[in-house]
């Protein structure tokens, strides 16, 4: 009798689905939340990219109020920034940071070229370099802070940090915030004569 009961229990599969469901569900939920969070980040990145491109075009117009341009970008990102605040660098949730650099032309949007005689990837040991901004020192970013003048090439960058939609990142020990960034490079409208900084040759320290 007892042996028959044991054999019947061994063959009985009722309730197995519930146990399997209980084991699989948490893993599936984590995967779904992680996927949704990634998709939302891609969506936010596309919105930010479009907003920055539009803002960059607005900034190239003579007399443009750059603070108003920034405000428009932040407004377009209201789904991420319920109570936005400016903070540079943008490292905490619901903060944003904008940066503008001006160059004489598109080729200057790069580290100043230098002769790497010792092949260490650094400008040092008296190596000659092209001082694009004529400030006497080698610069990884030779751009001048700000929007620049007529005909200048302006690099506009907006960085936004927001809190993840789901707690998956925190559960995995990662940061509870995500940071996205978008940049646009445009030439200012030639509403006046452009002032070009002459390039001189310098030596690395």
Segment roles from a protein language model:
Residues 3, 53-205:
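Short, conserved structural patches
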Residues 1-80:
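Alpha-helical assembly-interface signal, strongest on the long, hydrophobic N-terminal helix that forms
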């Amino acid at each position: 009798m007892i042996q028959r009961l044991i054999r019947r229990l061994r063959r009985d599969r009722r309730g197995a689905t519930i146990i399997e469901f209980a084991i699989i569900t948490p893993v599936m939920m984590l995967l779904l939340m992680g996927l949704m969070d990634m998709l939302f980040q891609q969506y936010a990145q596309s919105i930010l990219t479009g907003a920055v491109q539009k803002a960059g075009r607005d900034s190239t117009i003579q007399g443009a109020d750059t603070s108003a341009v920034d405000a428009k970008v932040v407004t377009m990102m209201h789904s991420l920034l319920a109570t936005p605040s400016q903070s540079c660098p943008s490292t905490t949730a619901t903060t944003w940071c904008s940066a503008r650099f001006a160059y004489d032309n598109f080729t200057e949007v790069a580290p100043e070229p230098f002769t790497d005689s010792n092949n260490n990837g650094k400008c040092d040991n008296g190596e000659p370099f092209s001082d694009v901004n004529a400030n006497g020192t080698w610069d990884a970013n030779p751009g001048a802070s700000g929007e620049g003048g007529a005909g200048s090439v302006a690099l506009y960058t907006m960085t936004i940090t927001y809190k993840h939609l789901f707690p998956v990142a925190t559960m995995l020990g990662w940061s509870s915030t995500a940071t996205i960034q978008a940049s646009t490079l445009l030439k200012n409208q030639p509403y006046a004569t452009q002032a070009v900084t002459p390039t001189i040759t310098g030596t690395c320290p």
